[in-house]
Amino acid sequence: MKFRFIFFFSFLIAEKADLVIQNAYVWTVDLSKPKAEAVAVRNNKIIFVGSNKAVQKYIDGNTNIIDAHGKLVLPGFNDNHVHFESTCRIVTGLNLLDVHQEKPFISRIRDVHERFTPGVWITGGLWSAYQAWESSSIGEEGRKAKINFFKPQRKMVDSFTAERPIFIQRFDRKMFFANSKALAIAGITKDRADPPNIHVERDKKGNPTGILTGSSVQKYFNNIIPPRSWEQRVWESEAVLKHCARFGVTSLSDMSDARQREIFYYLHNENKLTVRIHSRGYLDQWEKMSELGIKIGSGDSMIRLGTVKAWIDGIMGNSTARFYKAYSHNSDEFGIWRKIMFPWRSQDGGRDLQSNLEYLAIKADSAGIQLSVHAIGDAANGYLLDMMDRLNEHNGVKNRRFRLVHAQVIRPDDFKRFNNMSIIAEVQPYHCTDDMRWMEERIGHERSKGAYAFRSLWDSGAVVSFGSDSPGTNASRYPLNPMLGLYAAVTRQTLDGKPADGWFPDEKLSVEEAIQAYTLNSAYASFEENIKGSITEGKLADLVILSDNLLEIDPSKIKDVEVKTTIFNGTVIYQQ
């Protein structure tokens, strides 16, 4: 009896919390207990969700107490689609998407130059993207030709980059810029002829101005620019982790390759990884993954594996997304199919009527690996729904949680096909805010009704999961900030509030639904809903405290809400 009493008493002591949040408006995203006032955390798990009064028994002299002063507490955000390595380059490097004048061009380059280690190349840039969007649709060659694009000169930056090579590109990758240091390293001088398939713009004296065009420019410099060092890549990754903490992102699904996974494992081993990673391989790597025993659920709560990715069409920005009917602005253009869509050829030279995608998908699915496929246009999304039918016939109906990546434009008749198909609509709502400016010009009003159709997807039975697609494309920046995605899903307006009622307002989601899509549904998408995604006793202690209550403020103000505190794995990692 004495032993039992001591054991019971020890159990009570063990339940004292390391961290308690009280006086909060806790929105749990847990239907069994949607609201609370307080949360208690021990180690890295939530041990209590309930009232201010009841949480007191979890507090002792060692408990870190956070008084939320009525602020909104949510589960940490889970971004369903991030290109982490590319985001590193944007967050720490040169972003010129909105630059098309000399002063900001110089200022941005100077800022990066002062932050970078001596001798490291400055690359990227993508200048004049917003200039193109604001002037006209870049999908129409005739109109695009009228734009007087900004053309930088090496003399703008040579004075402070004498020992720093710079090689950057315009957003359309048809014009490049190099400073004097980079030109010298490349052997492009006044006295040398232009390299093959490269046009070097020169002044009246024959000196290179810094502007390069031609089909071989990128390849030529790729052979010169050294790969980023391990130390540089670690530094960049740590910078993005801080960026995530600032925005309350505690989990993300990464599209980067194995090199970035090496960085994640290194940071994890050093106890510096402050975001849970769901990392995807490529579809054609399924067999190697299977041989290594990798399948759905492989890994741990910090780095999760078991998903592969593929692409079947292009993007809206350059009119390569695949549609059943031609683009409205170009009657000869239907978009493209990626090579993976071509019929599979067996080793004996025979031809299988399945696409290579379908052949590989059946194999990977049979091996217990989750599939995720990029599809933008209605024909691309329609094909994947057809493929899902055949996948069910071939491998049987199961809880495969097929990730339909982007699902940007869906035909009206295809929405009903999502029901009972175990499909994750892996969408990025900020795309809507960005693309609505020109979508109807590209595909017309009727087809646009099925674009970024969050409500129709939700009501169809698909599990709608949200993310950012950070860092974006060569024509647009997609920030990691979840508030912009939530704003887009709830208002369907541009950041300056247009149109007044929202673009196709029937497709809006409620604030509660949008929060669920950015938390619990993204956890469900990676088979992790039992360990994270809601503020539930027993789940991982990843939490955010916001400056304003998303459930009470005018939806137009959501984009301006800030994260006050981010808690990851039971530890405060960001405080405003």
How would you name each of these model-derived features?
Residues 1-8:
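Sec-dependent signal peptide recognition
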Residues 8-17:
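Bacterial Sec-dependent signal peptides at the C-terminal "C-region" and cleavage site
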Residues 16-22, 27, 31-292, 306, ...:
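Divalent metal-binding segments
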Residues 17, 37, 531-534, 563:
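Short, conserved secondary-structure segments in the cores of folded domains
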Residues 83, 302-320, 422-433, 491:
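Non-cysteine beta-strand/loop elements that form the S-adenosyl-L-methionine
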Residues 267-271, 294-303, 395-397, 418-422:
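Acidic (Asp/Glu)-rich catalytic clusters
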Residues 362-372, 379-402, 406, 412-416, ...:
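His/Asp/Glu-enriched, well-ordered alpha-helical/loop segment
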Residues 562-576:
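Short peripheral tails and domain-boundary helices/loops at the edges of structured domains
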